[in-house]
Amino acid sequence: MASKVYFADLRADMHENLQQKLTRLMKTAGMGDIDFQDKFVAIKLHFGEPGNLAFLRPNWARTVADFVKERGGKPFLTDCNTLYVGGRKNALDHMDSAMLNGFNPMTTGCQIIIADGLKGSDEVEVPVAGGEYVKNAKIGRAVMDADVFISLTHFK
């Protein structure tokens, strides 16, 4: 069975701005029915490399974090370190990159936790059910420790 996909165009008008559209989209998709009360909620997104613009802006993350907090949840933004050398190869550089691109508790309304730790080795190996080529996946511990996982993604 195919998954439902919800879409909102990026046109804003005097009656509804983009953050209001995102809130309506989350409600329409059923996120308002999730029990967030006292739950740690991982909001996974890409913070972007320094100087790069291919990432969702912090105000989008703020909208999701506020939605979760209004329902009693404890949101945090997260991503894992990269395997390649760049601005996200370890947690310290990753946090600097996030801040340079505008992600911080003041702009997003929640903390940032790099899911796989300082050097990218804080992980949990989980089996991939029915995996033909990949039998196990290494998942960042903070993601595995979260009670709820929300993926806030972009496409190019």
Q: What name fits each language-model region?
A:
Residues 1-156:
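N-terminal and secondary-structure boundary signal
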